Amino acid sequence: EDCLYLNIYAPAHAETGSKLPVMVWFPGGAFETGSASIFDGSALASYENVLVVTIQYRLGIFGFFNTGDEHARGNWAFMDQVAALVWVQENIEFFGGDPRCVTIFGESAGAISVSSLILSPMTKGLFHKAIMASGVAIIPYLKASDYERNDDLQTIASICDCNASDSVALLQCLRAKSSEELLSISQKTKSFTRVVDGLFFPNELLDLLAQKLFHLVPSIIGVNNHECGFLLPMKEFPEILGGSNKSLALQLIHSVLHIPVQYSYLVADEYFHNKHSLLDIRNRFLDLLGDVFFVVPGLVTAQYHTDAGAPVYFYEFQHRPQCLKDRKPPFVKADHTDEIRFVFGGAFLKGNIVMFEEATEEEKALSRKMMRYWANFARTG
């Protein structure tokens, strides 16, 4: 399947020798969904005089399947991203871009990808700045245990009528299946995520950060002020959105965050102390999720980068888009993904890709400002 491609958006005047800054976008989607084709970089490119490249990489079982040995090491999605960056280095000047001024940026799984590329020795010299929105490589629970991987291998083997005890035989069997069959299997497995493969990741990620074994490039790391306000909990545990008592919150702290029962009460005391209404407890629980998955990992990563001597900027996006007023409950603030439409100038797009309907004049001004900030960083760091 020919699934690896990239799209290039350039100002009308760009030509070989223009040496414009290059911004390479990595789409999000939990490494399960998402596509380069749903993002239109033309507004950002034309307003800010930069080249915008959106790339596709393999997802799910196609992007992360591994057998735990040399026969299928995994991290294929990251290898796709490296290949895209190599292509940019070799070809972007023919579109008016400067291969010595490449900024990688992404949101959610795309930001996790950017953060991972910073940690990999395979990407030396392939980019020069990085922007991570709502995601970094050390987000908890991205790495599956050996038990979970082996359990998923058995599940796959059973569904496909393959032999899971031998990696070579399993791979040969799976390669005989259609992409549609493998895609349906991918939706039944959860453990195929990043692995320390000795190549892309030579060591555990926190060890790489602590030992300063990563690329010291200028970076922007950011979060929204309600990362788990609606989109993510709606997918995983929608029952919480109508309100929560402390019993349900404690149950979810244990089951979702895998915090032992004896410690969950310490967390509850920190977040739910003097909170009694169902709505107050819900709001604090959603704040807790945002802190665990996005805010704290982002701050920890920023501190490691700073300690290593790399320039870091940290932001919090706080605006709830007006176009979502009837699509999300009133209590939701700036939810996960809400900033993307501003960064890409969605309000100014006129093509088939709709990113920002009914933007107010104030939102258009905010979008212009964010595009300018992102592009200025791409130009000068």
Curated annotation (Swiss-Prot):
The keyword GTP-binding does not apply. InterPro entries: AB_hydrolase_fold (IPR029058), CarbesteraseB (IPR002018), Carboxylesterase_B_AS (IPR019826), Carboxylesterase_B_CS (IPR019819), Type-B_Carboxylest/Lipase (IPR050309). Disulfide bonds join C162-C173. GO terms for molecular function: carboxylesterase activity. N-glycosylated. It is an enzyme of class 3 (hydrolase). It is found in: Secreted. The active site is at S108 (acyl-ester intermediate), E227 (charge relay system), H336 (charge relay system). Its main location: secreted. Its EC number is 3.1.1.1. Glycans are attached at N163, N245. Pfam families: COesterase. The keyword Hydrolase applies. Detected in corpus and cauda epididymal fluid. Present in seminal fluid but not found to be associated with sperm (at protein level). Not expressed in other tissues. GO terms for cellular component: extracellular region. It catalyses: a carboxylic ester + H2O = an alcohol + a carboxylate + H(+). Keywords: Disulfide bond, Glycoprotein, Hydrolase, Secreted, Serine esterase. Component of a epididymal complex at least composed of soluble form of prion protein PRNP, CLU, BPI, CES5A, MANBA and GLB1. Belongs to the type-B carboxylesterase/lipase family. Involved in the detoxification of xenobiotics and in the activation of ester and amide prodrugs. PANTHER family: CARBOXYLESTERASE (PTHR11559). This is Carboxylesterase 5A. It comes from Ovis aries (Sheep). The gene is CES5A.
